[in-house]
Amino acid sequence: MNTNAADLPQPRERRRIDLLVGQYAESHRHPTNVAVHWVCVPIIVWCTLALMFVVHPWLCYAFVAASLVYYLRLSVPMAVVMAGFTAASVASFFVVPHVGWVALAAFVVTWIAQFVGHKIEGKKPSFLEDLQFLLVGPLFLLVKAFRKAGLPY
């Protein structure tokens, strides 16, 4: 039987999300640094949204909308999870007393921890080369969680 190469299944092209998370993972291999990221990245996302919300709620909403469009272009399941996280975050801003001060303090502490994690890693944070990686950090963690759970993303 003669088989044309075009008839054979082609290797799946790597999706953009896999490329971005793979690049991000290059500077996030040390177990201590990864553990620091598991704790700090969600807090940093919450703090970033809270600080924007304190400046003006619509600044926060615009950033959330733009971020969710970015996530939707990469992966619908990831966008759904991030939408849930951001919705819960924004809801919390209405009940956390002095949310701006709490966010500012937590932001400073978690970024210090992140830089300590990267010092242990021996590599500088990814976002210093490309700001896009500030949005990839949460995906790095979600991809790990989805893979561990055997869920498609």
Briefly describe each language-model feature range.
Residues 13, 49-61, 89-103:
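Helix-coil boundary and interhelical linker segments in multi-pass alpha-helical membrane proteins
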Residues 26-36, 56-60, 75, 96, ...:
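Membrane-interface helix-boundary signature
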Residues 67-78, 107-123, 141-145:
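Transmembrane alpha-helical segments that form the membrane-embedded catalytic/substrate-channel core
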Residues 78-87, 99-107, 120-130, 149-152:
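A cytosolic-side transmembrane-helix exit/cap motif
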Residues 86-98, 132-140:
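Small-residue-rich segments of transmembrane alpha-helices in multi-pass membrane proteins
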Residues 2-27, 119-153:
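Membrane-proximal soluble regions of multi-pass membrane proteins
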Residues 20-52, 67-77, 147:
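Membrane interfacial helix-start motif at the N-side
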Residues 57-95:
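Helix-adjacent hinge/juxtasegments
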